[in-house]
Swiss-Prot record:
Reported function: Effector proteins function to alter host cell physiology and promote bacterial survival in host tissues.
Family of this protein: Belongs to the Sif family.
Listed Pfam families: Sif
Subcellular localization, as worded in the UniProt entry: Secreted; Host cytoplasm
Record-given protein name: Secreted effector protein SifB
Amino acid sequence: MPITIGRGFLKSEMFSQSAISQRSFFTLLWEKIKDFFCDTQRSTADQYIKELCDVASPPDAQRLFDLFCKLYELSSPSCRGNFHFQHYKDAECQYTNLCIKDGEDIPLCIMIRQDHYYYEIMNRTVLCVDTQSAHLKRYSDINIKASTYVCEPLCCLFPERLQLSLSGGITFSVDLKNIEETLIAMAEKGNLCDWKEQERKAAISSRINLGIAQAGVTAIDDAIKNKIAAKVIENTNLKNAAFEPNYAQSSVTQIVYSCLFKNEILMNMLEESSSHGLLCLNELTEYVALQVHNSLFSEDLSSLVETTKNEAHHQS
């Protein structure tokens, strides 16, 4: 039966599996590829394969891509030729195939498209389709969805276009390539790693600070902020996260806002509609910024503001 996974708007349809068949499923795949890893790496590779074979809660597209890359990095140098990466793009479509081959057999094959993905393990298919769009919180008449693809320079799935559907049958998309190009330029200059370290701190801190502000609790000093932040970080399982009480906005949020603001079609739509304005632009910015953050760091911050608000009320 369909279940919601990943970022909350991916749907998965899969073959039903019993616990016994799932274990057998894992064993078959592991027996096929375990020799691709040296003894010191097999324990870690074993855990990644188990995650791949978890048909009850399959990984989303970004995690699939991450797992494939991790398995490649763990493999013995002499076996890396068994890992195949094929990326195709033209004016009409683009797709990425990630495969592990063993002679004529293909024990693992991952196919990633712009709006859906699926993967096969030992010729058993798990199909996951991006079928659900999201609604803006304040503007329920606007449906939004990010179309993603594999960005090789950044080594992640990256949002390529923002698709919007409005009441009255109006549909259009916003090109997000300027965001990607900005980050690729950093990578080419060798600045991306240092920037990402600061960006993650800013992204987490700014949303925690926003949640504290929206809670409307008075007399919160930096010590209380730090206490709230520590609890929120623990509850949301953000590994090795740091908090800065003075951060108000992340660089990604600024880059996304600039990209959307420069889109004439989007801005004309906002200006012509009496019910939409800069608040709508801010919500669109936050949606895209969350997708970009998830792409870069493989973590979902969408609940961070609400979690912080609840914790701030609890601490007051």
